[in-house]
Regions:
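Ubiquitin system architectures
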Residues: 2-112
Length: 112
């Protein structure tokens, strides 16, 4: 069984289903949320801290916005700031248990 902190309350707000698994679950696990702004939905993710931000973005887009054609047109934000190096491990960001990663289109578009 993996070491894990208790699931933060914020992680279960407005999410659906069981948490998605990201990376190896053999060590410590971060309980995160990923929200795709254009999908207006969020998922819970139990992530290995060594998984990359790019892997998290790919998983969230696949689950919440499967019709996306160009993942590189989406940015990942944490605490309001864009994460510029998506190849960095999640542990290298300011993410803690309960953090929410916001994934949104790089360019603002009018509401249809």
């Amino acid at each position: 069984m993996s070491e894990s902190a208790p699931i933060p309350f914020v992680s279960v707000l407005r999410t659906r289903g069981e948490p998605a698994k990201l990376g190896s679950q053999s060590g410590p696990v971060l309980h995160l949320r990923a929200q795709v702004l254009e999908a207006r939905d969020a998922i819970r993710i139990d992530a290995d801290p060594s998984a990359t931000v790019r892997d998290l973005k790919h998983l969230a887009l696949k689950e919440l916005y499967p019709d996306v054609r160009h993942e590189d047109e989406y940015v990942v934000k944490l605490n309001g700031f864009e994460i510029l190096d998506e190849d960095a491990p999640i542990a290298a960001t300011a993410a803690t248990n309960g953090s929410t990663f916001l994934i949104t289109d790089r360019r603002r578009r009018p509401v249809e």
